[in-house]
């Protein structure tokens, strides 16, 4: 079984996912998800997201990004814990 590089709490249609600043960067791998999702940054500094065939972009508190199902993407580690709100479509 593969451990996830985050902790997660789920309720209703949302997940709150927390990535620790102590996460090993090698755990933040390129991956795809089976469902489209809307991701909102609740807190975190210095983190970036990179979508397939795009340069990394900064992730700021309050940012919202749509990630289509089966699209490769990854996170790039920042300076603080990262907390995301995720709503799957």
What residues fall within each predicted segment?
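Acidic, low-complexity, intrinsically disordered interaction modules
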Residues: 39, 49-52
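Short acidic-glycine-tyrosine-enriched beta hairpin
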Residues: 52-70
């Amino acid at each position: 079984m593969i451990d996830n590089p985050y902790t997660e709490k789920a309720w209703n249609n949302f997940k709150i996912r927390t990535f620790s600043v102590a996460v090993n960067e090698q755990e933040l791998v390129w991956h795809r998800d089976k469902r489209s999702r809307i991701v909102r940054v609740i807190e975190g500094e210095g983190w970036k997201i990179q979508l397939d065939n795009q340069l990394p972009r900064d992730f700021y508190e309050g940012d919202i990004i749509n990630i289509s199902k089966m699209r490769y993407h990854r996170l790039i580690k920042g300076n603080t814990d990262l907390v995301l709100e995720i709503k799957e479509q």
